[in-house]
């Protein structure tokens, strides 16, 4: 047997039936979809319907909830702040607040406030005023000789992680 002699077993591959090709084809007019209704239209799939089997979303238990007044903080890392200070876009000699951070382009929007995280190195002596910060970020800023003031309640800022 050679590669060019390979064939599917008899009946293993079924030819595709071309539908909506006239009345003589046996699948003309409605193309096997029946008459009218949602399922006869194009682009329709009944989401979550599994052919009568109990769908996955009903087999699994309900769990959790979404807090309606949840605070969403924009995250800024120390390394990024240092990069902007080095580039001259942030002035380390002046106090830096959330509006200055957004104006410099460190983050595009502040959402419910800005939360500073400790990723990266900080060498500049900064006076930061932000909504929240991680403990390691506060330690890194104070180690560099700077200070940080948190405007949001500590519990709210800590839960934003």
Swiss-Prot record:
The keyword Ribonucleoprotein applies. GO terms for cellular component: large ribosomal subunit. Residues 1-51 are annotated as: Disordered. Residues 1-13 have a biased composition (Basic and acidic residues). GO terms for biological process: translation. Residues 23-35 have a biased composition (Gly residues). SUPFAM superfamilies: Ribosomal proteins L15p and L18e (SSF52080). GO terms for molecular function: rRNA binding; structural constituent of ribosome. Coiled coil: none annotated. InterPro entries: Ribosomal_uL15, Ribosomal_uL15/eL18, Ribosomal_uL15/eL18_sf, Ribosomal_uL15_bac-type, Ribosomal_uL15_CS. The keyword RNA-binding applies. Keywords: Ribonucleoprotein, Ribosomal protein, RNA-binding, rRNA-binding. Belongs to the universal ribosomal protein uL15 family. Binds to the 23S rRNA. This is Large ribosomal subunit protein uL15. It comes from Cereibacter sphaeroides (strain ATCC 17023 / DSM 158 / JCM 6121 / CCUG 31486 / LMG 2827 / NBRC 12203 / NCIMB 8253 / ATH 2.4.1.). The gene is rplO.
């Amino acid at each position: 047997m050679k590669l060019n002699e390979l064939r599917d077993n008899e009946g293993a591959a079924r030819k595709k039936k071309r539908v909506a090709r006239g009345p003589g084809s046996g699948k003309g007019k409605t193309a096997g979809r029946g008459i009218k209704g949602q399922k006869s239209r194009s682009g329709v799939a009944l989401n979550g319907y599994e052919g009568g089997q109990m769908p996955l979303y009903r087999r699994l238990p309900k769990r959790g909830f979404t807090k309606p007044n949840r605070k969403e903080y924009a995250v800024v890392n120390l390394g990024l702040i240092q990069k902007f200070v080095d580039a001259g876009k942030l002035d380390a000699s002046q106090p830096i607040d959330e509006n200055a951070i957004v104006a410099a382009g460190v983050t595009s929007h502040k959402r419910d406030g800005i939360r500073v995280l400790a990723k990266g190195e900080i060498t500049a002596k900064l006076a930061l005023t932000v909504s929240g910060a991680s403990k390691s970020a506060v330690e890194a800023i104070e180690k560099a000789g700077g200070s940080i003031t948190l405007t949001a309640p500590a519990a709210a800022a800590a839960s934003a992680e």
